[in-house]
UniProtKB/Swiss-Prot annotation:
Gene transcribed to yield this protein: DCTN2
Family that this chain belongs to: Belongs to the dynactin subunit 2 family.
Region annotated Disordered, chain positions: 1-25, 187-207
Modified residues (N-acetylalanine): 2
Post-translational modification Phosphotyrosine, affected residues: 6, 88
Species whose genome carries this gene: Sus scrofa
Name of the molecule in the record: Dynactin subunit 2
Length: 405
């Protein structure tokens, strides 16, 4: 049984089950939650923020090369290697092969170019600070310029040939230019060789270059479709620029909302041809006749409007004339209506009282009738009881007399 001192405390729900609520986790989950919270708030854990969009853009249209890969556990003399990747993959299909001097030179140029770009970005974003650093962006830019000058001054292009001067930003264009230059050189060599007369067959020149051209029709179709889409886009922009919006107030712009540029040009040409001198005279004559009709319609409309206005004014005047005698008696009529209103209210109250009195009178009459009926019954009962009592007394007297004898 509960303690009686807690019986009348406020806020206690009666005739309801007891509910114990808490915001804490169960005991089994509290230790795990504390460990996760400590790991999230600890300064020893490095939290890396990953941008999904940047990661997608970086690895978009990239494929993993599986040539020469072996993940098996077979025993052999050669080492089984899986995927190999580095910061700079400029060897193409020759991953795992030692770099040639040309490839190393291209990689160094690429690294210097990337470092220069990053330093320029740092110089644009980082503000000058009072604290001294070991390598400030300005000093680093100077060192990069000196390194690039030293790399260019090594004259590796002369040693490695024109292949080392490939433009890394546009390798396909650079290869095409190199192909054209070597073809021109081959033509010049053939022209010089045909000018001299030789009696014996000369062996084939080993300096000639043989090229293999591989056609890619899918890429050609894709590039052609891209060019067509670009052309359609430019035509759409041109049509949107030339086309004007439909203006209901301007008759000259009616019908210029064509489906394409050719329809708009045809409509404009038809409108311009309508401005011929011979056509303008006919248009002017028709406009003069139309203007005369418009003036007549305006005059007729003005006369009709004047007649309508006069009729309305006459009706209003007659109404005012009829209202004048009524307006003089209106205050007395209002006063009388107010008085009659009070009288009507008193009469209504008197009628309600009469109705209540009549109802009360009927109730009293009914009560009197009931009381009279009850009185008659009581009198009858009293007579019967009185006669019975008298008979009983007579019997008692007779018995008393008999007992006295």
């Amino acid at each position: 049984m509960a303690d009686p001192k807690y019986a009348d405390l406020p806020g206690i729900a009666r005739n309801e089950p007891d509910v114990y609520e808490t915001s804490d986790l169960p005991e089994d989950d509290q230790a795990e939650f504390d460990a996760e919270l400590e790991e999230l708030t600890s300064t020893s854990v490095e939290h890396i923020i990953v941008n999904p969009n940047a990661a997608y853009d970086k690895f978009k249209d990239k494929r993993v090369g599986t040539k020469g890969l072996d993940f098996s556990d077979r025993i052999g003399k050669t080492k089984r290697t899986g995927y190999e990747s580095g910061e700079y993959e400029m060897l193409g299909e020759g991953l795992g092969v030692k770099e040639t001097p040309q490839q190393k030179y291209q990689r160094l140029l690429h690294e210097v170019q990337e470092l220069t770009t990053e330093v320029e970005k740092i110089k644009m974003t980082v503000k000058e600070s009072a604290t001294e650093e070991k390598l400030t962006p300005v000093v680093l830019a100077k060192q990069l310029a000196a390194l690039k000058q030293q790399l260019v001054a090594s004259h590796l292009e002369k040693l490695l040939g024109p292949d080392a001067a490939i433009n890394l930003t546009d390798p396909d264009g650079a290869l095409a230019k190199r192909l054209l230059l070597q073809l021109e050189a081959t033509k010049n060599t053939k022209g010089a060789g045909s000018g001299g007369k030789t009696t014996s067959g000369s062996p084939p020149d080993s300096s000639l270059v043989t090229y293999e051209l591989h056609s890619r029709p899918e890429q050609d179709k894709f590039s052609q479709a891209a060019k067509v889409a670009e052309l359609e886009k430019r035509l759409t922009e041109l049509e949107a620029t030339v086309r004007c919006d439909q203006d209901a107030q301007n008759p000259l712009s009616a019908g210029l909302q064509g489906a394409c540029l050719m329809e708009t040009v045809e409509l404009l040409q038809a409108k311009v041809s309508a401005l011929d001198l011979a056509v303008l005279d006919q248009v002017e004559a028709r406009l003069q006749s139309v203007l005369g009709k418009v003036n007549e319609i305006a005059k007729h409309k003005a006369s009709v409007e004047d007649a309508d206005t006069q009729s309305k004014v006459h009706q209003l005047y007659e109404t005012i004339q009829r209202w004048s005698p009524i307006a003089s008696t209106l205050p007395e009529l209002v006063q009388r209506l107010v008085t009659i209103k009070q009288l009507h209210e008193q009469a209504m109250q008197f009628g309600q009282l009469l109705t209540h009195l009549d109802t009360t009178q009927q109730m009293i009459a009914c009560s009197l009738k009931d009381n009279a009926t009850l009185l008659t019954q009581v009198q009858t009962t009293m007579r019967e009881n009185l006669s019975t009592v008298e008979g009983n007394f007579a019997n008692i007297d007779e018995r008393m007399k008999k007992l006295g004898k």
